[in-house]
Amino acid sequence: MIRKGLLFICLLCLGGWQLTAAERIDEAKHVLVDDFETYAESIYNSIDDKDLNYKAFQTGLKGYVKLASEGKIEKNSFLTVIDMSRSANENRFFLIDLQQKKIIHKSIVAHGKNSGGEYARSFSNKIGSFKSSIGFYKTAETYKGKHGLSLRLDGLEYSNSNARQRAIVIHAADYVSQVFIKNNGRLGRSLGCPSLPAKGYEEIISKIKNGTLLFVYYPEGHYLKNSQLANHKQRTSSVQGILKETI
């Protein structure tokens, strides 16, 4: 990327007079995007887990850097990605340590019963929809409910802003298990919550509670086009700076 930057500077020196100011700004934006892509790819390649979709990770990283730099999430190294483009029978919950560049936990996770069967295909922010909601969430406080230890979530976008009012939380459920898949052909479904397997879930909640970032991904065109977090342009220096500040 150093060579790219030098090439860009040389082009401005040698032929910049041929470009308008607007064209030079646009060209600079492309360089910034390329820088971020390269940095995101380097982390992704270090993680080296084919279950993790690159686009899901890259989009989640964009939101992480923007929100952490603005002080809107805790500046620790955890980013949780739920990839709703994958089968519910496959691992699609990924707890990533960006500092160590590795996945420290992955598992199956349920989606809302009205979002689809084995695959989630429909999403909603409406109260009573019993569908999953895509987008960025900030984890909040824990409580003990009918499912045991549970973690409240606050939606940060138009696509999930009703999360708290809808009681969308992370909790464990007996229908989230390989036994259920074997007996029913697919994973069980929730009322909209990202439900986890019972084994080890309390440790996961303990790691990500109180202000870390969770991103629920699905390649839905309207969301990817209109989300301010998914479309934010990042500087490589911003990414590196935020990660250096993590615990």
Q: Across the structure, where does each feature detected by a protein language model lie?
A:
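Active-site proximal loops enriched in glycine and acidic residues that flank catalytic Cys/His/Asp
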Residues: 218
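Cell wall/extracellular polymer interaction/catalysis modules
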Residues: 23-191, 198-212, 221-247
